[in-house]
Amino acid sequence: MTQIKTSTGEERHFKILDTAGEDDYQTMIDEWIKVADGFLLLFAINDKESFEALKAKIIRIKKNNKDKIPIVLVGNKCDLESKREVDKQVALDYAKSIGAKYYETSALTDENKNCKVVFQQCAHLIVSKFNSEVKGKSCPCSIY
């Protein structure tokens, strides 16, 4: 379990599963999707194929989980702006079309630009959804 402070300052515990696109996990992904409380999905802004693969994952999520599951899309490697293959507006429009939040990050730039923010936002969305559905219970939530 990982403790994350939401964007509103609440501290909650989350189970985070990082598949990093590993093919080894393919047989288990549908089961994880069914029990997940939210998704933080990354693609590389300098790799259009990773953006297209992300779209396939979203279809799989929508098929195996509720339509209103919190999703945060993340365009990673924003330090490689000169090599960008996925237009920021295209990513923003896609995120909006599926009801997701969108951020761009870089794990290499000073202070890991927006890395903490994406986890906080995902946590906030999950906690908000959980609180609206189940009053008075703590959130044993999972992010995949």
Regions found by a protein language model. Give the residues of each.
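TRAFAC-class small GTPase G-domain
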Residues: M1-V134, Y144
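Fe(II)/2-oxoglutarate
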Residues: C139-S142
